Amino acid sequence: MQKFAFRPLRAALFFALLVSSGFAAAQGLTVSPAQLNFGTVLETQPDSLPLSVTNTLTRTVTVTDIRFYTTYGAPAFSTPYRWFTLAPGASNTIWVKFSPRHNIYHNSELVIENDGLRGYPHVDLVGQGRYSNAYYDSTENKSEEALKTAIKSTTTNGSISLGYNIARDSMFMLIDNQRRNGQGATQNTLESVYTGQLVVGYTDRTDAQTNYGFNTEHTFPQTYFNSLEPMKSDLHHLFPCDDISNGQRGNNPFAEVTSPTWSDGGSTSDGFRFEPRDAHKGRAARAMFFFTLRYQNYNGFLTSQENVLRNWHAAFPPDAIDRARNEAIFALQRNRNPFIDYPQFIDRITSISTLSTAPVLRSLDPMQDTIIYGSVLPAATTVYTFVVVNNGNTAVSFSNFNLTPTPVLSFAGTGADTTIGPGDALALQIACTPSTMSAVNGLLTFNTNVPGSTSFSVPIYANDPIFSAIDEADRVNLRLYPNPAGDAAWLIADNILSGPVYAYDLTGRSLGQLPTQQLGNRLQLSLAGLAPGCYLLGLHTNAGPVFTRVVKE
């Protein structure tokens, strides 16, 4: 999910106060530091920082996954350490990498999923992405209209209008001449961008035009800007083209043509719309984007085609030919096409053709749908950390926190209303202090301002026979791998395993026996009959059942 955070560095928000010295129970997994601040990192030079994860419990804990969130649909933070086991009191150092695709301030979260029954620790991740090409410094931390304005200024300031004759001569003889531009031709060679037709052996532009039927395609048709300079001679939207396909394109918008009346070399037209061959779709899209931001959307020409051009831009990204062409034009014209250098700029502009405003996205990712303590000793306080991440692009408000039953369940701090910003996490610490070993079946409820998710109800279980039996899995060193799992997983123990395995949902309802295959101290389980979700697996031995949890993907 997209993460937008163009603001100064700040500490991660903790909803609950830290547990006081009166709380005796261990907190499960702990992390250090609580925040990884990567500083400024270039897109060409990713950086990594260490994170220490410690098991404070008296039983083994397995880290089942490390969850990250995306920035404009792509991950900026990552780690290769996604699954590992920690013995009681043990620590492990993992390295987290920051690889920014965008030159913006990143604010995100890392959440460590585990089977320790004390909640999931989270780590605040912050860093400033920066582009190695200083030409784009003015675009840093900008999006939507502010980014469009920065791109317009960047591509305008210092640029040179060559004039139409010089621009065309440069295109025919240097920029797109495959003998001169590194494409390996031994003679002057041009390729029509729409049909792939080649002109070989021409002597100059006039020769190519007069004797070979080639001319210059204006990707944004010059009719719409009255053939005025500097638009007419801007090389970023000029391409060599044969006369026939150029005429077929005419002033028509780009589109996907389903019933063509003309086709050649992969390009098609129905007389009203024009679809270029695949080799030119991405280039046409980026030329249109550049032109509209550098100048304007004359006569609204881009508006009807922007969506299909965005699709082509994504499907046909810039290649070495595009990058070399961009460099050659920069050497002559002193400006660049930003969508060739950094195609991801498009992710930060909702609309090129009209007023660009990011849609408001309120979204939450609660880490668990059920709070399970396992066994909790009487008169001792055990704390569970319930984490919710704001993975939208606007602040989310929380209100009306409530726990039942009380005083067995209480907030380790305060249950006051609060608000968390995009990229932040709410870490709600819930204390369980039973007076006996009797089962505790409780409920956490709260409200938010997220459409479709205004009310949350999270079941809480402690000393429940089926959930407490999960602890027994650690005492017999029963392990499940992989977890999360697909359609198959392995139960592994120090001794020979025997007995049927049953699956249960989180209410304790039996879902039936699972198919198994015994291989020494391992049991291969078939999970194909389970839908994606979280389940309990019970190995029924002669000494009684032993339970562990699995996440089915």
Identify what each model region corresponds to.
Residues 206-358:
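Domain-level detector of nuclease and nuclease-like folds
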Residues 28-30, 57-95, 361-370, 393-429:
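Surface-exposed binding patches on compact interaction domains or structured appendages
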Residues 43-51, 92, 101-110, 378-386, ...:
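Short, solvent-exposed loop/turn segments enriched in Ser/Thr/Gly
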Residues 375-376, 469-494, 503-511, 532-534, ...:
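Surface-exposed, proline-anchored Ser/Thr-rich loop/turn motifs
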